[in-house]
Structures are given as structure tokens and as C-alpha cells.
């Protein structure tokens, strides 16, 4: 039987949009890795009655309820009192938690305020979850027959404290009780939208084995597919997961750059290093973002030679040798200029491959035939015979300036990746 869990995130700041709920994301991922799916995430305010209501509903539905927030020493921290009231149990001082709390203050050369004693209180009969990075004790409690002996976990809302508790105590505790095996495999794509991707893989989705799900994870730079398989047998889970991934690759292979958690810049870097090739970039509309992404990868000095940002027409002429006539005739945002930028970059740098970007990121400077979101890419590379080949591509995007710049850089990396496929 699959163990089902829910997350309850407590804090008015979450409901007001003053904080992003990163805790829930971390907990869900950690539980998924040990075969415990999260079926619901609930957020509620700091009022005691709201907390009790949220905990009651979650404990009635889920085998495990994990709670973050509301365990601190201030007046708006009401989670512990609400949970104890719901379970109809007293709060007891934990000697181990109290000793750790005193040590926390001593190690910082401070005297512990008497009011901080409450940070060492836990629900009667619960298991202490030590806080090795803060003051508030966590706990794992059996909710009793009233809630079908479901389990309640209380942790602070401070991300660093919650993560330490999860890694050191909570995950090891539940890993022994979960008999399920889970396997996640990302299928990372580029150059294709979510709708078209869904059309390509609809047959795969319709015939997936029991226990396997497919999630679409669109983001600014592309669309990822996540194949998740859960079951009781390691061999069966691996077989079913691999089978679905292979079926997806058979239909989307030309758009897939990885089936592991790596970025396109990492993939391009690996290909360049494997082939003993070097790269240089000439950027206008991306303003150095492309070079930044390539050099974010450790070891990129093996293949990245240089990058130049040529924003003005004069800079394009001066640094890359783009012809004045080409700029006048076609304009800076054109396939012709992109080609000359890439070829000039290849010549100046001595790299094996060079990529150029010129476009209109927005929100202004568009014209009737050159709208915001227009991108012209150029790729120049040295061929085995010594000659130079140059290719261009024109693409159109819709988004904010920041989104367009990211998509432009992603498209440039995609172009390089495609260019390396036949090497």
C-alpha cells in the first residue's frame, strides 16, 4: 500500500505573498525520493483555529502530515499549542531538547531567556526531532485512534532548520517504513512547445504501465518531461521507467538533449570537451548572458575561448569586421549581420565554432517587419577540410525583456548543440 502524505505550511506571510513556499517543494521532493507521494499542500494563516482546522482535515486524509512554521518564540507562533489541543495532549519539556537549547546559547556567549524554555516543549508521547541549526524543537507524533494513528510531524518554518531536520531525522525515520521504490527520469527538451510535445507523446501516455506517470514541466527556457514510476520491486520499477523513457525518445529524440538533471550549457560543454573543440560567442541582444551561461560550468576553460558584446553597429564593425554596407542594407537585426558576426568571431578568436546573437529583446525599438522578440542567430564553424561553414536562423518569441534574453540565449545554445550532433 502506498503511504500518502500532505504538507501544511503555516504563516500569514505565505498567504500575503511575502514569502515563497520553498519548504513545501523541498519536502515533496525528499519524500518522493523514498517512495512517499505528497497528495496535497495546504497553506494557512497563524490563527490558532485555522491551524487546528487545517491539521484536522489533513490528518483525516493522509497517513503522514508534515507541518512547517509557527514553532518560534513569538506571539504569532501558535502551531504547537494548536496541534497539542487537536490531539488532546499536554506539552512536556524535553530534557534532550532543553539541554541542546542551553548549549545553543552558551556556545554563542549568551544567557538563555526564561521565555525560551517553551522552545524545548514537545507534545506528550511524541518523538523529538532535534534542531541542530536553531532553537525550536521538532517532533513526530502518533495522532492516535481518532485520526487512525496517522503521523504528525512538526518542524520550524526556517528553511535551513527544516532541511536539517528532514535530512537528519525525518527522512531516515520514514525511509524504513516505506516499502515502495520510486524512480524519476527527466527528459529535457528544447526547440519545441508544450502543445506540440504533448501531441507527439500522446500515444505513450495512453499506454503507460500502472504506477508510471508523466508530468510536463514547462519553464522559460524549454519544456521538461518527468517520468515517475513507483512500485514494490526495484527491477520492475527500473524496467517500466526505462521503457517509457525509450518510447518518449523514439518520438521526441530530435528535441531531447538529456535524460538526466543537466542544463543545455552543461550538455554543450560536454560535447565540446569530448570532441576537443573550442567555442567563442559574439553577442548583441543577449548582452553577455550566453557567455555567462557557458562559463558558469566548472572546467569551461577547456573549451570556451572568448566572448564579445557588440551592442552598437560601430562595435560590430570594429571588433568583428561586420561590413558597413551589410548593416545599412539589412539592419543590425538580420540573418546577414548574424552570419558576419559569427564568421568574424570565428576568425578573431581562432575557435572551432562561433555563435552570434542579434535581436530585439524589447519592450521598444520594434518596427513593422522586425517585432519585439525577433532573434537572428549565426553559427560559424571550421569544417574538417579547412573551409568555414556559416548557418543562420531567425526565430520569434513573446515575453518580457528578461524572458526574451533568456530564451535567446537558450536558442543559441540549442543551435550550437544541433551543430555538434553531426561531429
UniProtKB/Swiss-Prot annotation:
Q: Which InterPro entries match?
A: CinA, CinA-like_C, CinA_C, CinA_KH, Competence-induced_CinA, MoaB/Mog-like_dom_sf, MoaB/Mog_dom
Q: Which SUPFAM superfamilies match?
A: CinA-like (SSF142433), Molybdenum cofactor biosynthesis proteins (SSF53218)
Pfam family, any one: CinA_KH
The lineage's top-level taxon is Bacteria
Family the entry assigns: Belongs to the CinA family.
Write down what this protein is called. Answer: CinA-like protein
Organism, as annotated: Chlorobium phaeobacteroides (strain DSM 266 / SMG 266 / 2430)
Amino acid at each position: 500500500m502506498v503511504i500518502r502524505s500532505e504538507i501544511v505550511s503555516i504563516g500569514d506571510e505565505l498567504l500575503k505573498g511575502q514569502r515563497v513556499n520553498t519548504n513545501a517543494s523541498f519536502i515533496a521532493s525528499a519524500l518522493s525520493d523514498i517512495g512517499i507521494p505528497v497528495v496535497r499542500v495546504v497553506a494557512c494563516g497563524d490563527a490558532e483555529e485555522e491551524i487546528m482546522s487545517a491539521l484536522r482535515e489533513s490528518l483525516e486524509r493522509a497517513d503522514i502530515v508534515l507541518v512547517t512554521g509557527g514553532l518560534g518564540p513569538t506571539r504569532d507562533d501558535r502551531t504547537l499549542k494548536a496541534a497539542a489541543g487537536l490531539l488532546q495532549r499536554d506539552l512536556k519539556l524535553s530534557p534532550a531538547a532543553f539541554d541542546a537549547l542551553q548549549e545553543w546559547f552558551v556556545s554563542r556567549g549568551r544567557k538563555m531567556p526564561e521565555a525560551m524554555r517553551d522552545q524545548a516543549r514537545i507534545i506528550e508521547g511524541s518523538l523529538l526531532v532535534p534542531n541542530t541549526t536553531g532553537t525550536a524543537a521538532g517532533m513526530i507524533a502518533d495522532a492516535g485512534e481518532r485520526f487512525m494513528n496517522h503521523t504528525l510531524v512538526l518542524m520550524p518554518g526556517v528553511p535551513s532548520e527544516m532541511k536539517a531536520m528532514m535530512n537528519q531525522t525525518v527522512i531516515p525515520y520514514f525511509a524504513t517504513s516505506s516499502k515502495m521504490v520510486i524512480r524519476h527520469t527527466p527528459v529535457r527538451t528544447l526547440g519545441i512547445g508544450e502543445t506540440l510535445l504533448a501531441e507527439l507523446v500522446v500515444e505513450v501516455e495512453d499506454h503507460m504501465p500502472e504506477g508510471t506517470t508523466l508530468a510536463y514541466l514547462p519553464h522559460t527556457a524549454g519544456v521538461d518531461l518527468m517520468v515517475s514510476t513507483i512500485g514494490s520491486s526495484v527491477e520492475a520499477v527500473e524496467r517500466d521507467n526505462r521503457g517509457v523513457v525509450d518510447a518518449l525518445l523514439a518520438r521526441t529524440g530530435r528535441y531531447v538533449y538529456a535524460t538526466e538533471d543537466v542544463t543545455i550549457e552543461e550538455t554543450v560543454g560536454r560535447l565540446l570537451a569530448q570532441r576537443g573543440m573550442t567555442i567563442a560567442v559574439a553577442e548583441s541582444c543577449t548582452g553577455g548572458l550566453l557567455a555567462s551561461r557557458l562559463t558558469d560550468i566548472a572546467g569551461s576553460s577547456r573549451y570556451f575561448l572568448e566572448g564579445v558584446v557588440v551592442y552598437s553597429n560601430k562595435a560590430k564593425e570594429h571588433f568583428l569586421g561586420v561590413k558597413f554596407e551589410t548593416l545599412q542594407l539589412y539592419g543590425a537585426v538580420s540573418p546577414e549581420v548574424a552570419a558576419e558576426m559569427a564568421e568574424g568571431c570565428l576568425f578573431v578568436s581562432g575557435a572551432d565554432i562561433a555563435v552570434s546573437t542579434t535581436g530585439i529583446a524589447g519592450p521598444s525599438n520594434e518596427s513593422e517587419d522586425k517585432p519585439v522578440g525577433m532573434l537572428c542567430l549565426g553559427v560559424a564553424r571550421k569544417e574538417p577540410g579547412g573551409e568555414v561553414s556559416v548557418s543562420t536562423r531567425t526565430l520569434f518569441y513573446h515575453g518580457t525583456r528578461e524572458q526574451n534574453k533568456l530564451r535567446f540565449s537558450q536558442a543559441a545554445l540549442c543551435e550550437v548543440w544541433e551543430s555538434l550532433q553531426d561531429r
